[in-house]
């Protein structure tokens, strides 16, 4: 197994090495898919967003600043693509409210059910808050990285994150969590 660093693989990619691209895809695909699926809630759309992220990586590899994390750069590209898709959807579709799930005993719930409830709560957030929440809380990006990914100021990121956290907490309280 090749243990080349992301920086080394990016240097190879800039030279046209398709094997380097395959290694980068293998290394980062799962994280990007989790991000895209969490934001879009649709497997096909998430797959498309990840595919477009790697196409942009291939086409624009020279724009990558090797002093920064490649994972963060890829998350930024993917999140922007998802954000564009969410804006497109908002223009074309009405928001569908989800039915709340009543939880009698949260201690008896399986981890998968808790995750499903969290995802359900996050899915009800407006697109900006959802993107900020996912990038910051789930993907672990720093506020300045989220700001760069979403074209917001760090203050806007913090404000959106505060509202998103409050909303998610309130939704989870309704489930008894």
Indicate where each model-derived feature is located.
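Short, charged helix-capping/linker segments at alpha-helix termini
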Residues: 2, 14-23, 33-52, 154, ...
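Internal acidic/polar
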Residues: 2-6, 91-115, 142
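Amphipathic, Lys/Arg- and hydrophobic-enriched alpha-helical face
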Residues: 25-43, 60, 122, 167, ...
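Structural recognition of an alpha-helix C-terminal capping motif at a helix-to-coil junction
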Residues: 34, 48-55, 59, 68-80
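Helix-turn-helix DNA-binding module
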Residues: 123, 127, 131, 135, ...
